[in-house]
């Protein structure tokens, strides 16, 4: 029975880690042991950041909608309540995009929300 060696797998594994560590500062980009730790930490941070980004995008959409709606004399919460009562099912991403790119259509949505609230008084 022939003796199995791990050199091929080991080379591939080291190359993969060092490729992921390309651009890291100092020893972390060239030394396998340091690169392994740095890559592990970087991947963990990116995993968390992908989840955090979802919340920050939602906060951004809400800020944009709030800014657009306040110019029409409504608060964000009253506007969203009006949409719910009017049966308009648009998510915050679409509403935010509409407020920026198509103010005319967004104005129609605001008017529908005000009508559902009954007059639109703040």
Swiss-Prot record:
GO molecular function, one term: structural constituent of ribosome
Disulfide bonds: none
GO cellular component, one term: ribosome
Matches recorded under Pfam families: Ribosomal_L20 (PF00453)
Gene: rplT
Example of a GO biological process term: ribosomal large subunit assembly
UniProt keyword Signal, yes or no: no
Annotated protein name in UniProt: Large ribosomal subunit protein bL20
Family: Belongs to the bacterial ribosomal protein bL20 family.
SUPFAM superfamilies tied to this protein: Ribosomal protein L20
InterPro entries named among the record's database cross-references: Ribosomal_bL20, RIBOSOMAL_L20_CS, Ribosomal_protein_bL20_C
Domain of life the protein comes from: Bacteria
Function field: Binds directly to 23S ribosomal RNA and is necessary for the in vitro assembly process of the 50S ribosomal subunit. It is not involved in the protein synthesizing functions of that subunit.
Record keywords: Ribonucleoprotein, Ribosomal protein, RNA-binding, rRNA-binding
UniProt KW Calcium keyword: no
